[in-house]
């Protein structure tokens, strides 16, 4: 049987409020250390992508989320410098007041769409955020 390299699978979560503000974490580790990013991370073996999204949101932000929409799958082979990583992005609601940086996050902050181009954002998360904002606005 031939050996096939398999991409890693991650989940990213766009946690938003009724004013279209959203939460980003500041990354504690490389790659993109000290850059802002969506909460998210690797899907564990035996775990659904949906459960990974909920778990990662809780681990990195202390926020319990309710997933709202599956936004898209992002699979460009070079989107992560660690190797080929495919991410599944979701929109989610949660109580911002519960937010606190944990795990791989060294900080957490609330941002508005108007500030998006001023922020140094990791990976392809700026594109993901823009896609999420389109879906959230459409569903208002």
Identify the meaning behind each predicted range.
Residues 1-22, 91:
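Conserved N-terminal beta-strand and adjoining loop/helix that marks the start
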Residues 3-7, 35, 80-86:
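A generic structural micro-feature
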Residues 9-11, 86-88, 104:
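Residues that flank catalytic or metal-binding motifs in active/ligand-binding sites
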Residues 17, 75-98, 132, 136:
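Active-site-adjacent beta-strand/loop module that shapes the phosphate/pyrophosphate-binding cleft
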Residues 21-59:
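Conserved Nudix-box catalytic region and its N-terminal flanking loop in Nudix hydrolases
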Residues 43, 74, 94, 113-116:
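Hydrophobic pocket-lining residues within nucleotide cofactor-binding pockets
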Residues 63-72:
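A short coil-to-beta-strand element that immediately follows conserved catalytic motifs
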Residues 91, 100-133:
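NUDIX/MutT-family hydrolases
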């Amino acid at each position: 049987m031939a050996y096939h390299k398999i991409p890693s699978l991650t989940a990213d979560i766009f946690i938003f409020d009724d004013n279209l503000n959203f939460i980003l974490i500041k990354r504690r580790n490389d790659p993109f250390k000290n850059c802002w990013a969506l909460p998210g991370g690797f899907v564990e073996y035996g775990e659904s992508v949906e459960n990974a999204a909920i778990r990662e949101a809780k681990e990195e932000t202390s926020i319990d989320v309710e997933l709202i929409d599956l936004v898209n799958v992002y699979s460009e082979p070079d989107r992560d410098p660690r190797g080929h990583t495919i991410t599944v992005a979701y929109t989610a609601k949660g109580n911002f007041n519960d937010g606190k940086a944990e795990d791989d996050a060294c900080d957490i902050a609330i941002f508005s769409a108007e500030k998006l181009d001023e922020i140094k954002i990791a990976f392809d998360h700026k594109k993901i955020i823009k896609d999420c904002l389109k879906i959230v606005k459409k569903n208002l």
